[in-house]
Amino acid sequence: MNPILWKPASNRYLQELLTKMIAGKHYLNQQNLVINPPNSDNYSQLRFHRDLPYQHYVSSRPLAINALYAVDDFTIENGATYVVPASHKSELFPSDNFINNSQIQIPVKAGTFLVLDCMLYHAAASNRTISPRIGLNHVYSTPMLRPQIEWAKVFSENSQIFPTNANELLGLDFTPPTSVAEFLSNRRNK
C-alpha cells in the first residue's frame, strides 16, 4: 500500500475514535478516492446514499464507520458533504421532503476527517468551482462484515510490503475458513 494512502488510514487519533465507536475489533473494509469533478451535476455521489451494501439494515451500534479524509478543503462552493442527521437509525430511506428539510452541509478543512456512521444518509453537493474536490474515503467495520477489498490479494499481486500493524488494521487475521473442516478445526482450537 502506498504510504500516502496508509498514513490517513492508520491515523492514531482516528483509530482511537474508531475503537470507541465500533464495539470490539475493527478493520479497514475499503479505501477509495472520491473525486467531485468541477461544474458537474452528473456525479454519482450527488445522490443520497449509505456506504454499506446492506441499505435497509440498521443496528443499535455502528457496524461500520466512514472516515472521509479531506485531501482538499471541502467547501460549500466545491461540494462539501450533506448529511441527514439521525437517518442511520431508520431502516427506510428518508423521503425527499424530509431530506430537503433536514439536510446539513458540513465544510471540512484539508487534512482532517469527516467521520460518519456508514448508514447515515449523505451525499456530495455539486462542485461549482473550476477544480476537482478530492477526498480519500475509508470504511472501517466490525469483522462480521465481509471486506469490500481483499487486502491480502492486493498486496500479493503488487508484491508490496505490508506496513507496520497492517495485519490487524487490514483484517488479515479475520480470514474466514475455506471449508467446513477448517471451520470445525478452528472452533476446536479455541
Put a short name on every predicted segment.
Residues M1, N29, L63-I65, E77-G79, ...:
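Residues that flank catalytic or metal-binding motifs in active/ligand-binding sites
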Residues M1-F48, P53-Q55:
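Non-heme Fe(II)-dependent double-stranded beta-helix
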Residues A9, V84, L116:
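A conserved hydrophobic position in a structured secondary element of the catalytic/binding core
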Residues Q31-L33, A86, C118-L120:
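Short, well-ordered beta-to-alpha junction loops that form the rim of enzyme active sites
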Residues N39-P107, L145-A152:
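Catalytic core of non-heme Fe(II) oxygenases with the double-stranded beta-helix
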Residues S90-V115, M119-Y121, A125-K190:
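Conserved double-stranded beta-helix
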Residues Q31-L33, A67-Y69, L136-Y140:
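A structural signal for short, well-ordered beta-strand segments
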